[in-house]
Design a protein with these regions (language model features):
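A structural signal for short loop-to-beta-strand junctions that line the ligand-binding cleft
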Residues: 1-29, 59, 161-168, 243-251
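Hinge/lid segment of periplasmic solute-binding proteins
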Residues: 1-22, 46, 149-155, 227, ...
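Extracytoplasmic/periplasmic solute-binding protein
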Residues: 4-17, 22, 43-94, 125-127
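A bilobed periplasmic-binding-protein/Venus flytrap-type ligand-binding module shared by bacterial periplasmic
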Residues: 25-28, 170-183
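Glycine-centered hinge/linker elements that transmit conformational signals in sensory
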Residues: 48-52, 83-113, 154-157
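Short amphipathic alpha-helical coupling segments at ligand-binding clamshell hinges
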Residues: 93-100, 173, 182-194, 202, ...
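Periplasmic-binding protein-like
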Residues: 98-99, 148-176
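Long, aromatic- and glycine/proline-rich binding clefts that accommodate carbohydrate-like moieties
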Residues: 152-156, 205-267, 298-306
Length: 306
């Protein structure tokens, strides 16, 4: 799935190099003291938020397109139409997910933004969804709580068959070859060599030898990532989450998606606007830009939302 943001129109335009994705961090000592179990679903989360608030504590889940898309995919929605010509935010799955997502901030008052490491360290936020590479920060910045925290998969959405959809949205970087490259064969061999499991593993370990645990490398190569010096407990949970990582596709004009999602989100949170109507309003703006860019690039324009 780390290929998704580099795939368009049947072509693949990069080889994944790094992959970051969210995981659930929690303070084992504080949750045990409060008698709170690690939440498995978002329904569990809302129940837990009430218990945390009674103790002047918070649950962390930042307001962002990436986090909304996690809930969207868990509810069988998508960011763009199947033909990649329009936003899918006007579909019922997206509207339902947006209503659930904004409710966390409107009614349960979780913070839109926060500084994770400090709040997690001092116990104000004993449980939060954050990028798994925050592991690096906590190992160095919060060494005094070593052994007092752990990770688990991000809470999911219950399916009709009783299983839990644990999909999360990650972000990837990739290696590309410039179109005008003179030595294409040599460049291609280098890209294959650089992104291979052995070399990515060696690179990750050498960087960590030089800079310490805070420099743990977010390899997109799953084999290389597995062979980095994780503890058994940490990697066991990490590998469980990796199986459910997806990425948001890239489309012409797609930069308006994050911009207008943010506009819609903040309008609902800060101005108490109707989630459905607000999302539909900004979806029109997203689609207008996608249409303009498709016209600019000479692509066939059509599909839903135009």
């Amino acid at each position: 799935n780390s290929l998704i943001p580099f795939t368009y129109g049947g072509g693949v335009y990069a080889i994944p190099e790094t992959l970051s994705f969210p995981i659930l961090f929690y303070r084992t000592d504080i949750l045990a003291e409060l008698g709170i179990e690690v939440p498995k679903t978002w329904d569990d989360v809302t129940e837990m938020i009430v218990d945390l608030s009674h103790n002047n504590m918070q649950f962390g889940f930042a307001g962002s397109l990436q986090n909304f898309a996690t809930m969207l995919y868990q509810n069988n929605g998508k960011v763009y139409s199947d033909d990649a010509t329009a936003s899918a935010f006007n579909e019922n799955e997206a509207i339902t997910a947006f209503e659930k997502y904004t409710k966390l901030y409107q009614y349960f008052k979780i913070p839109v933004t926060f500084e994770f490491a400090n709040r997690f360290r001092n116990g104000q936020m004993p449980i939060a969804v954050a990028d798994y590479m925050q592991y690096n920060t906590l190992r160095i910045f919060a060494s005094e709580i070593d052994g007092l925290w752990s990770i688990a998969p991000v809470p999911g959405t219950m399916r009709s068959d009783g299983t839990i959809n644990r999909t999360v949205v990650g972000t990837a970087t990739g290696c590309i070859m410039i179109k005008g490259t003179k030595n294409k064969e040599s460049a291609w061999k280098f890209m294959q060599w650089w992104t291979s499991a052995d070399i990515q593993e060696q690179y990750g370990k050498k960087v960590e030898e030089k800079l310490g645990a805070s420099a743990r490398y977010a390899a997109a190569n799953a084999v290389a990532l597995e062979h980095l010096p994780w503890s058994y407990e940490f990697y066991n949970e990490l590998s469980s989450q990796i199986k459910n990582v997806t990425c948001i596709p890239e489309v012409p004009g797609g930069y308006f998606t994050s911009r207008h999602f943010s506009n819609a989100f903040r309008k609902v949170i800060y101005q108490n606007e109707n989630p459905r109507e607000t999302l539909l309003e900004y979806t029109k703006e997203i689609n207008a830009e996608i249409t303009d860019k498709r016209n600019e690039f000479g692509l066939t324009t059509g599909g839903k939302g135009h």
